[in-house]
């Protein structure tokens, strides 16, 4: 009886294997590279970073209490996180093919919708906290 072959998805990456401080250092470097790439290549990410540069100090200077300020800051940072995911989805789809395809469009539209919801969340959180 033949030995079952592992599924390609189960294969371990040849890039794995670093542990301890080396792994942490490499992960940090890759994260910074991702932030640089997003800032360099994604207009929406740059706009949202500059929005955060304005809103984060505004949250700290607001009359809201500590919890309110924390929620305001978290809502702004959530936009950055969601935009990073959206940009990663778009890059992966473009890597597969630049051809128009309904599933590619669907994935990109869904990612964009996630960013929109995160932005609406900022407006809602800020309105609720500042009106309290």
Please describe what each predicted stretch is.
Residues 103-109:
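Membrane-interface alpha-helices at helix entry/exit sites of multi-pass transporters
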Residues 92:
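Alpha-helical membrane segments and immediately flanking helix-loop junctions
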Residues 1-88, 96, 100, 114-132:
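Hydrophobic alpha-helical transmembrane segments
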């Amino acid at each position: 009886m033949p030995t079952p072959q592992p599924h390609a998805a189960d294969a371990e990456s040849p890039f794995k294997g670093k542990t301890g401080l080396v792994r942490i250092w490499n992960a940090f470097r890759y994260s910074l590279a991702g932030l640089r790439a997003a800032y360099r290549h994604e207009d929406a990410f740059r706009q949202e970073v500059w929005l955060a540069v304005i809103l984060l100090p505004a949250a700290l200077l607001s009359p809201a209490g500590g919890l309110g300020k924390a929620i305001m800051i978290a809502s702004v940072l959530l936009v950055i996180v969601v935009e990073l995911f959206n940009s990663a989805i778009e890059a992966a789809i473009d890597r597969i093919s630049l051809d128009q395809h309904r599933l590619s469009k669907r994935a990109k539209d869904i990612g964009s919708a996630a960013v929109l919801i995160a932005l609406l969340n900022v407006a809602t959180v800020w309105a609720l906290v500042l009106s309290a």
